[in-house]
């Protein structure tokens, strides 16, 4: 039985969706083994993301432990918060992309990234300043030049200035290797034979590459590349491949404004965190 009509029928939304939003998918099921020290990592990621970008933040939490969820609800208080069972990172990101209007500038990040002030504004500058951009990252690693930059280089060859060589500090590659659990010396030996591709267009300079663990885009562009998966952590190289295959540019800021932390904050990483916040974070 129903009496009358819902008073919201035919009414416009009272809430206006933001034109820009930074999002993180979190997953901390426990604080044991691999996850033993990750609570601090996730908290640092979210604090630095908000500290470095004056935009709303959305967190999609995939089945995390109560301690993280209590912190999200009581202390961090993101502008948008979804608490769900673990539906998988890729499926969460697909849902996030579909939640916002197609023109929305939206950032996607894993929960173990560190951000410097200005990461958002510089990424948006490239997204708006270059044509047909699919992904812009704030964290460059030379290894990423192997990941689907054909369309970027093809476009740049005719429309921009391209420089090829070793431009990034070796310390950045050491940070990369340590953050993903690689042995540093073999990694450095490998990347010394690889080149960076620096692109300059209308006074803006960036690198050809993007990281699927952290990037900004437009919701309507990236939404078509996320698909439902029965895997908790789907390998995302296919995302890179499809964006590149459709002719979109994949770019990274010329200054390092983000960093992958890994699952442990050691003394060296703590120095990076202090630098990112402009002081030692408390």
Where are these regions (language model features)?
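C-terminal catalytic/acceptor-binding lobe
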Residues: 1-10, 14-17, 185-282
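N-proximal low-complexity "stem/linker" segments adjacent to membrane-targeting elements
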Residues: 1-48
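Acidic helix N-cap motif at the loop->helix transition within catalytic regions
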Residues: 33-34, 65-74
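A conserved acidic beta->alpha catalytic loop
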Residues: 48, 52, 60-69
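Conserved donor nucleotide-binding strand/loop of the catalytic core
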Residues: 73-87
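Active-site nucleotide-sugar/metal-binding loop of Leloir-type enzymes
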Residues: 94-105
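Short beta-strand-to-loop acidic/aromatic patch adjacent to the donor-nucleotide binding site
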Residues: 103-114
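Conserved catalytic core of nucleotide-sugar-dependent glycosyltransferases
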Residues: 116, 120-221
């Amino acid at each position: 039985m129903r009496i009358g009509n819902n008073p919201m029928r035919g009414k416009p939304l009272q809430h206006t969706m933001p034109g820009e939003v930074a999002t993180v998918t979190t997953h901390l099921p426990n604080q044991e083994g691999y996850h033993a020290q990750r609570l601090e990592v996730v908290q640092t990621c979210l604090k630095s993301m908000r500290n470095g970008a004056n935009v709303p933040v959305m967190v999609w939490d995939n089945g995390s432990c109560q301690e993280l969820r209590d912190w999200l609800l009581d202390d961090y208080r993101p502008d948008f918060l979804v608490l769900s069972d673990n539906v998988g990172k890729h499926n969460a990101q697909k849902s996030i992309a579909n939640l916002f209007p197609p023109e929305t500038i939206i950032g996607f990040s894993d929960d173990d990234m560190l951000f410097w002030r200005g990461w958002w504004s510089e990424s948006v500058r490239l997204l708006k300043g270059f044509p047909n951009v699919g992904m812009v990252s704030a964290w460059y690693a030379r290894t990423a030049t192997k990941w689907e930059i054909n369309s970027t280089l093809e476009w740049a060859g005719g429309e921009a200035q391209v420089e090829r060589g070793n431009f990034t500090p070796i310390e950045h590659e050491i940070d990369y290797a340590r953050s993903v659990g690689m042995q540093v010396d073999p990694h450095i030996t490998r990347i010394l034979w690889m080149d960076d591709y620096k692109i300059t267009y209308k006074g803006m300079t960036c690198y050809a590459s993007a990281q699927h663990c952290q990037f900004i885009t437009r919701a309507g562009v990236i939404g078509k590349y996320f698909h439902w998966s029965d895997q908790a952590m789907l390998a995302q190289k296919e995302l890179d491949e499809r964006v590149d295959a459709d002719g979109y540019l994949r770019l990274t800021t010329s200054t390092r404004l983000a960093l992958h932390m890994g699952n442990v904050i050691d003394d060296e990483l703590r120095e990076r965190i202090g630098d990112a916040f402009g002081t030692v974070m408390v």
